[in-house]
């Protein structure tokens, strides 16, 4: 926990390869190191993300018809854009999820709270009557699309899937694109091995060319301005989306720019007034631990586990920023947007009227929102010791 090796410590292996495939999912830690060195986003839109949370709900026997797919937009979100999804499964189970845009200006955006509010809608109240939440999960997903894709190749490396922003955010689908990118990478690597290539850029560019000729481009190029349009708000986005639908994704402006999620957050008083936590929109529905949960109750359903004696993998660069600037002005967004109650601002014992940050890192479910959305870029998510994290089953 204090950075000292334990008796069973084993040093990591140094693996060497002719070519490395970065396929770490959203906000990959190794690829971030590489991207800093090679500036793979030069000339691109910055990465932008959405935070998704979902639950698996067991309903009474005979009440659910499997195979329904429902996507909605808007409710219950107010100051942020996003949507919801409802999928019905065999065995009278329902997946209910909510995805919120992290380039929101709202410092009190709380996807977990909004998911609980979603279940108060009369349609879902009827569908989920008598149901009980079995599992919960949360994760960020890259949303910038085609114009936020980094350089895909270099000397001895390529990047695939979510790490390369390969998600169709209109359909909330990315697994098929991740698989296709892996297949493109495998094809390039196989040809390189057969030809005994050194995997210089001339060789790894073959992966880029295969991606350009694949379903990846056709899917992502069609929705290349989708997220950027919706980020402007529901009403403002409607003519933009209509124009894009009529022009194969181009719309009125191509390409539409985006701003890093951390830079879009506004001060709490500017969004919610002098007493933001008293506003009705920021209240959690009554908890019953059956259908409605607080965050700690939901975290239990993830099965997340970390060794209590392991080092904190959530690195806060400057806790004074949290105390003196972020909490007074922004009301500590990390406390709110984290779907797992990792961050708390507790009264400072020796400084009346001030608050200190406490990091409950063993609660972490590895969504990486804190690394993305902190308005001061003050938190870095690092890989935890020994494979700790959520024990997802159906989620």
What are the language-model segments listed below?
Residues 328-362, 369-391:
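Iron-sulfur cluster-binding cysteine motifs and their immediate structural context
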Residues 165-171, 183, 187-235, 351-353, ...:
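Active-site-proximal substrate-binding core of FAD-dependent oxidoreductases
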Residues 153, 159-168, 175-189, 203, ...:
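Extended, hydrophobic alpha-helical segments in both membrane/secreted and soluble proteins
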Residues 1-126, 165, 181-184, 188:
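Predominantly flavin-linked oxidoreductase catalytic cores and closely associated redox partners
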Residues 6, 10, 42, 170-178, ...:
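Alpha-helix N-cap/helix-initiation motif
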Residues 44, 106-109, 148-151, 169-177, ...:
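Alpha-helix capping and helix-loop boundary segments enriched in small/acidic/polar residues
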Residues 138-169, 297-311, 322-337, 344:
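FAD-binding beta-loop-beta segment adjacent to the flavin cofactor pocket
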Residues 230-289:
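C-terminal auxiliary extensions adjacent to catalytic cores
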